[in-house]
């Protein structure tokens, strides 16, 4: 699902709210979440999951074209951990 599809779906489910308001709301939610991660804050949405930053150590990588070794700097990357309810919903029963 893309951001546009989410906005369209929410607008259809809530016909009393204009599509523009839904679009602005979704954009603001994502902006606030991005800002929180930028400030190294953890985001927890009960029943859905949590977002946090994971630190990646500096390491030696390899250029796939040339095979040459390349030094990669340390960095923080966003990480999502699914919550219990989300895991249960997507787990298909065999």
UniProtKB/Swiss-Prot annotation:
According to its UniProt entry, one GO biological process term is: regulation of translation
Q: Recorded GO terms, molecular function? A: DNA binding; structural constituent of chromatin
Key words, A-Z: DNA recombination, DNA-binding, Transcription, Transcription regulation, Translation regulation
Q: By its UniProt entry, which Gene3D superfamilies does this protein fall under?
A: IHF-like DNA-binding proteins
Q: Which SMART domains match?
A: BHL (SM00411)
Q: Which SUPFAM superfamilies match?
A: IHF-like DNA-binding proteins
The record's annotation in CDD domains points to: IHF_B (cd13836)
UniProt key word Transcription: yes
Q: Which GO terms describe its cellular component?
A: chromosome; cytosol
* Subunit note: Heterodimer of an alpha and a beta chain.
Q: What family name appears in the similarity comment?
A: Belongs to the bacterial histone-like protein family.
* Described purpose of this protein according to its UniProt entry: This protein is one of the two subunits of integration host factor, a specific DNA-binding protein that functions in genetic recombination as well as in transcriptional and translational control.
Specify the protein name: Integration host factor subunit beta
**Organism phylogeny:** Bacteria, Pseudomonadati, Pseudomonadota, Gammaproteobacteria, Pasteurellales
